[in-house]
Amino acid sequence: MTVLWTDEVTVTHKEHVMAMLAMAFPIPAGKTDQWKKFMSELAGARKAEFAASRRSLGVRERTFLQHTPQGDLVLVTLEGDHPETAFAEFSKRTDPFTVWFKQQVSEIHGMDLIAPPPGPMPQQLIVSHS
């Protein structure tokens, strides 16, 4: 798995302090339409399964598409009490939805979500508070 950037920060949401894990994943050339179809399924036919999956992991996921001159990126944030633990727990799951999700990620990004990301998570360097 190629992780271009990750960060863990603390954010306040409804006066509850939560951790946030942010990750960026490149979309290989020619795969953006397939990725958009995957996102449409998560927002449509598989919305309930997706919500239940993230709820059972104790996280809220937000996913963004970023177009750059170098290619498209997926930006993913996980918010919760322990998003890094949720990411590790997700990699171990074998229920039908999770297997399908991992297969989609593998086909689009060429990443194996069963294996942990290479290397340690980076250190947070700067946090801006209002």
Predicted regions and their residues:
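Short, Lys/Arg-enriched N-terminal segments with co-localized hydrophobic residues
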Residues: 3-17
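A short catalytic or substrate-binding loop motif that flags glycine-/basic-rich loops and adjacent residues
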Residues: 17, 55-57, 68-69
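Short, extreme N-terminal segment that most often corresponds to the first beta-strand
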Residues: 19-30, 35
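Short, well-ordered beta-strand segments in beta-rich or mixed alpha/beta enzyme
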Residues: 21-26, 61-92
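Short, conserved charged micro-motifs
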Residues: 31-37, 84-88
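N-terminal ordered "arm"
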Residues: 37-47
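An amphipathic, aromatic/His-enriched active-site/gating alpha helix that lines ligand/cofactor pockets
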Residues: 48-60, 80-119
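Intrinsically disordered, low-complexity regulatory regions enriched in serine/threonine/proline
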Residues: 117-130
